Amino acid sequence: MIKTAETYHVPVLLKQSIDGLDIKSGGIYIDVTFGGGGHSREILKRINGNGHLYSFDQDEDAEKNVNNIIAELSNDNDTTSTEHNCGLTFVRSNFRYLKNWMRYYDIDHIDGLLADLGVSSHHFDDETRGFSFRFDGPLDMRMNKRAGMTAADVVNEYEEEALADIFYLYGELKTSRRIAAAIIKARDIKKIETTQDFIKAVEPLFKREREKKDMAKLFQALRIEVNHEMDALKEMLLSATELLDKGGRLSVITYHSLEDRIVKNIMKTGNAEGKMKQDFFGRIETPFKLINNKVIIPDEEEQLKNPRSRSAKLRIAEKR
């Protein structure tokens, strides 16, 4: 069997998230976070040629894994296998454009959508991408290498107040203003171009016992800003809400409180702010029925096998 690129993380909560889709014969499904293809592979196995899967990823590295999936699921003697005849269409795009792409493919309803919002091990472990403070490399952080703005652009060009807001809102760091001031001071001396340049500028502000946690939050905040992650997530989930048929399922895995709050609010109220809507008679209107009232988390065995799954939370909802 041809393996998916080993640099991508092991699919988190694989069985629970796919079970949550309640896959039906002939259904149309979407995996908006293809990555190494782990979740897509399982969906395709359950569709078993009777239905279709649209898989999204904006990273060109992820696209290289598509042929592996096709080879695994196709007859070894079939040399003409393609994405289409194994029930898969790969879309190299940010998932925020979900509705546009479905219109392009003339799809006006779907039966289920899965999103695994975690940054893959592939990104964290590649020093050339700049996602991790463990390596020295270009301060990049773009999920889509074709996108314009890098993390270096953010730290070198944003005003001090804007930087402070990013670190406070997306990193939930109480020392955001001090961090922003330290960056301004450092870049006045020398342009911040690498992860180590950035770390040197802010490291003195962190207490030793919290240094790794706070540095991770700081890198998270920059990554979210560079990739417009919160806006993209809101747009994708609202599009999914429109596209899902009655009884269709939404299965979403989150890894930090900011994205989890958005997912929870949209599943409960239909909007990212969590504002309850009422009809003419004062009855609360909600687009979804929650399948799990409490979040599903990896069990101890999965957390031991895959430490990066520890912060994962799965929420599942069904369209009313």
Please annotate each region the language model reported.
Residues 1-320:
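S-adenosyl-L-methionine-dependent methyltransferase catalytic core, i.e., the SAM/SAH-binding region
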